[in-house]
């Protein structure tokens, strides 16, 4: 039973995750709309981009613009938890979006109710404050689920991120004394998001600052087969999105409904064999059994892993309870040299 089935690689119409990092005067929103319109129209003649706004309604400022107006708009309000971003993205997908802008994705990290606030409010079992790496464990797990969901979305995503100075402490030689001293240097700009966010992106652009440089960018990440579209020093236009659509359209189409079913099957299998077969026997799933059969080995592997993990967790919890009882008894019972061990 193979966990991974290997076959000849095919260039499929993978979803593009485009990240744009910039200051408030870099023109991120307008530039995102230009790309989104070019991409949406290139994918479908009557295509329209969707914009999910977290900036107190500022995303609607271009609603009547002669060039980029007419897009679909929705507002996501606090709390900016990963789960609410997942819900908002899901709502756009259900509404038929092919291309979605999120302005700004930074709020999931540092906005009201975002990951930083979640980590800072983490408590111990006794109600005390957690600190250090421990407090980040569960919040980062929730963030990872959002990124996993984003990577499997059926839409192309343009994510606007706020920028901040990338400051670093370095050793620098003091020529007057011949000694090294600690100095803070500015390495440029970085995004207000989790530090590994870039790894999940197809393309990452750092927007230039200043009204006279709106739309100009520096390429921070771009795969080789898209470098003819994105070049440092270029200015974003609707043609940028159209070129991206052309690249997508030249690749093999994906069966979106089958992919959605496969992802649902994997999610069900991740809850164990029993939950998977409940999903497998749903009346909406049964007609697709033949199409889903090639994925059955993977479903089985995932459900087995889930059941094994659950069994280990149950055993660990039982051992923990037993240990706690033994420790409690050892504190109250008198020490007997002839019988030092206290057993259940």
Place the predicted regions along the sequence by residue.
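Amphipathic alpha-helical transducer elements in NTP-driven molecular machines
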Residues: 29, 78-86, 130-152, 186-198
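Acidic surface patches and DE-rich sequence motifs
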Residues: 77, 124, 172-174, 212, ...
């Amino acid at each position: 039973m193979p966990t991974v089935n290997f076959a000849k690689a095919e260039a499929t119409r993978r979803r593009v995750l485009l990240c744009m990092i910039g200051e408030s005067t870099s023109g991120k929103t307008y530039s995102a709309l230009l790309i989104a319109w070019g991409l949406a129209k290139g994918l479908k003649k009557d295509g329209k981009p969707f914009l999910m706004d977290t900036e107190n309604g500022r995303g609607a400022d271009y609603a009547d613009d002669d060039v980029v107006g007419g897009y679909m708009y929705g507002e996501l309000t606090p709390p900016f938890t990963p789960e609410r971003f997942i819900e908002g993205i899901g709502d756009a997908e259900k509404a038929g979006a092919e291309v979605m802008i999120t302005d700004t994705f930074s709020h999931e990290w540092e906005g009201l109710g975002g990951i930083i606030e979640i980590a800072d409010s983490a408590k111990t079992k006794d109600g005390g404050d957690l600190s250090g790496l421990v407090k980040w464990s569960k919040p980062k797990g929730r963030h990872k689920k959002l990124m996993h969901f984003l990577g499997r979305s059926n839409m192309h995503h343009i994510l606007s991120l706020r920028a901040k100075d990338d400051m670093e402490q370095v050793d620098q030689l003091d020529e007057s004394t011949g000694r090294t001293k600690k100095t803070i240097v500015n390495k440029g700009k970085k995004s207000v998001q989790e530090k590994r966010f870039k790894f999940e992106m197809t393309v990452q652009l750092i927007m230039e600052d200043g009204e006279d440089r709106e739309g100009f960018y520096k390429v921070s990440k771009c795969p080789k087969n898209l470098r003819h579209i994105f070049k440092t020093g270029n200015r974003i236009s609707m043609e940028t999105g159209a070129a991206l659509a052309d690249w997508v359209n030249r690749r093999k189409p994906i069966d979106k409904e089958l992919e959605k079913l496969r992802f649902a099957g994997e999610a069900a299998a991740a809850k164990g064999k029993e939950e998977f077969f409940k999903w497998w026997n749903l009346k909406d799933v049964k007609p697709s059994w033949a199409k889903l059969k090639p994925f059955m080995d993977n479903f089985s592997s995932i459900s087995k892993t889930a059941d094994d993990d659950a069994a280990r967790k149950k055993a660990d919890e039982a051992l923990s309870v037993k240990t706690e009882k033994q420790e409690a008894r050892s504190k109250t019972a008198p020490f007997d040299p002839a019988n030092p061990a206290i057993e259940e």
